[in-house]
Amino acid sequence: MKAIVLREPGAPLVLEEIPDPQPGPGEAVAKVLACGAGLTVHHARAGRLNVATPRVLGHEITGEIVATGPDVTGLRRGDGVTAYFYMTCGECRWCRIDRETLCENFRGYVGREIDGGYAEYIKLPASSFIKLPDGLDWRKHPAEAGVICDAIATPVKVTRKARIAPTDTVAVFGAGGGLGVHMLQVARWVHARKVIAVDLAAAKFEACVKAGADITIDASEGRVGEQLLEATGGKGIDVAVDFVSAPSTAEAALAALGKGGRYVTLGGHGGTFTAYPGEMLRRELELLGSRYATKEEVVESLELVARGELWPMVTEKVPLEQAEALHQRLDKALVTGRAALMVT
């Protein structure tokens, strides 16, 4: 089969012919229709994440089951599927209370520890596949169906983690990126009172407004905290969702939080930032980390799209062979929303 392979961290992605995968016990193989080019893939390619190379990256798949191994139940040929890319045990105390991202027996990630979806076929543990719901036309919209499992499920979890309510003003840092634009969408879906997009790339603001932003703030001006306070009449924001998590964004967000404000970080590669306990006490601030989503939240996100309540923003779709060129555009922050590789 054709596959895009990362030979070593930081190296260009290359198109290769590799053997078709064969399912073993408890495994299934899916034909890949499309795979999103998400932030995790971007960091892995750049060498910012540990990846056992050579490796086929990618996890935001739309696929069709073509083979199952012994002992597999619940999947059959022809099923439309996506992937839950955290490989969890399903048995520890965290998995049993539907907090799989904290699994005590975590086995790694699809597209990092095992080969992912930048290929014509993907083999996974059967438990890592999630069936696509009726009402979601995954054959017609494979790119959009594939990115739901991360680009929408991750923001859905944030709304719960941060307890976003209709009275809240929400600011999204890195709002023009693949997770950011969908966070704007989901914040609007939960009826946040005001949604503010913060990004360095003003060219992305039109898409941010389309996704649900009421206000846009150009972070390149270097006065984000001040602008957020101005936008809220000095009261401050209720929730800051930070997909950048650099010291500058974290500190600007904390400075702009109002009473009872919640800061949520999802940027795993940010630096050390300063938070003042006295201010946290005075304003009763909360610092929160939110990591991916649970399987239940992925299923819910798929259903939301199937019902037409949300729709993924995939702005670039390119053939598998153009993976490296696409990631070069991602390197330069030239992609708004999500991009996807079209495989078959």
Which residues fall in each region the model found?
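Glycine-rich cofactor phosphate-binding loops and adjacent beta1-alpha1 units
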Residues: 162-163, 206-286
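Rossmann-fold dehydrogenase core element
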Residues: 262-264, 275-314
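Mid-domain Rossmann-like dinucleotide-binding core that forms the NAD(H)/NADP(H) cofactor-binding site
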Residues: 127, 136-222, 226
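Glycine-rich beta-strand-centered segment in the early N-terminal region that forms part
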Residues: 21-36, 45-96, 114, 135-137
